[in-house]
């Protein structure tokens, strides 16, 4: 049996329709289908087919079939459409039976999300658990405060550049293998940090490798979310994933305080991160499947069947919602695409290998650079607040270390609320737009409308925080403005990340890596110079200037909302 009958019967590749007396073949790739046509009922499909004079899956178009042949053909057509109805997309009355976006069951997606959220927590935790121990490490290593603080600057610098490397490979070579490589490197480095003798040069080198290994988590995680979650739910999916990275700066100082409160146990900071990293590596190796779409498609194991085996199956993919016979330790090692058929490659194309040229093209792309710089400015304002908050609480408000740590809970909770509410509202507005504009492709830039609100909240919080400290307002006022700054920043970060992954789905990890690069560079510069600027300008005017800088983000987002459609969102 050849491949053509298999494609016509089971996959619905060729759909012939009568149009102006001619027969045409219509093909829609998976990435081109709109969400307004998903989950259409069987009655609606039958009604559309009744009103259209076309012959689906017609084996002999020139013949005049008998009545019995027509009945058999109709029955075969109904079986083909029903088998894909619950999970398919129907972009036009001419087309039926399309591939579901993902084959992974709900339970398996919960496992995937649990793992990537936990891994996402490890990266920021590795950087932030170290900061409360800086005075202690300064004494242990017998160096100046400037030298020991430089280990933080080096970490942030490498943490900014690292995602460019991981993001480039993640969109080409697979997610799971890179997770295993980065976690293995992180585990080795953390063990060495906990065990090597005191030597400042060794500390610098190991912190560089620690930052490089831990910098993979956000770009790989965002890519994984794009693999398994369709665009209509991606806003809240990104919000759930970002719970991990957002919790890192909140929990890490608390853990560090608990470890250090009983004495000189700073090595256990790295011991704790080693244990957490080891657990993550085991989870990834044992439970996480490969999800990169150009390798495994939508996750259906039948893509890997031989052609003759697939042809003998009544339904080539997606029979129900469960995945049977899933095994432990799946997809270990470097993976090749499970299928080389033209149909698979058309729907799940492999992007070209990444390099410096690719990133240069991304940086020159207005939607990417504007969104990345906008997020970086907001992130810089937040880090300026984060660095100065503890300093002024200790010197101006006479807070203890325990009280300072508790004060950070307020902006931390605001970060989580901003990410979650922004993600859910983004998806809700997207679904409303699709319902009011049937049969039209959703403009991804529509999500950025929410950024206007988040930017204004961040500007108000930033300026208000500076003047509240300048006039020595009550501590509760500081908490309110800090919450506004944190809420607005994560609100915008979530929406921007969702926008980039929807605009460039095949380069999700790469575009998020570029955005992370600008964001972390901004945070590193801001945290390094903010105290000097506050001393020179006064904290009120300094944070007013930061708020005005954030207004540049407002201009950039407005530009994209107005002129986005003049740019063609081509995959790189």
From Swiss-Prot:
InterPro entries: MFS (IPR011701), MFS_dom (IPR020846), MFS_trans_sf (IPR036259). It is found in: Prospore membrane. Keywords: Membrane, Phosphoprotein, Sporulation, Transmembrane, Transmembrane helix, Transport. Residues 1-110, 171-184, 229-240, 289-366, 420-446, 494-520, 564-572 are cytoplasmic. It is a multi-pass membrane protein. It holds the Pfam family MFS_1. Induction: During sporulation. Residues 548-572 are annotated as: Required for the localization to the prospore membrane. Residues 1-28, 49-95 are annotated as: Disordered. Belongs to the major facilitator superfamily. CAR1 family. Prospore-specific dityrosine transporter responsible for translocation of dityrosine through the prospore membrane and required for the formation of the outermost layer of the spore. This is Dityrosine transporter 1. It comes from Saccharomyces cerevisiae (strain ATCC 204508 / S288c) (Baker's yeast). The lineage of its organism: Eukaryota, Fungi, Dikarya, Ascomycota, Saccharomycotina.
